[in-house]
Amino acid sequence: MEILVKYENGFRFSAECRGYTATTGQGDDGKKERDGMWPAQLFEASIGMCIGGYIAKFCREQGIAYDDMTVELSRHIKTVSSGTKPSGAKISRTTGIDAQIRLGAKLSQEQRQGILEAADNCHITKSIEEGLQIVCTLVDVEANSTLKTI
């Protein structure tokens, strides 16, 4: 197991990985200091941090100052009614993300191109672009069996 996600309360979950913990959502216990971004926001922030990491690596290798770098993300969301879900619930998804990269350093055209290529190499965006498959299984603790989604 690489990451363990645990329900806390309300709509708050925590994820543990390599000794680090991230918290998402809001609990109903009044402990606002334990609340965090919603999971979709954390997902999108992860993309920005991944892009930033690849740019930082490129800038370090090229001797380009990047201490003041920011990556500003704007997301596009699509919401549709689900005709296939029994509840008829609305389903939303992020359909696109615009990332604006800001660096204070004076850059040549070649450096600009290199930075954009580095940004495009982000592991998360490459995984999404190539088609990320997620398989959910439900473990029946009492029966000690596993059910996969269809």
Identify the meaning behind each predicted range.
Residues 1-45, 55-150:
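Extended beta-strand/beta-hairpin segments
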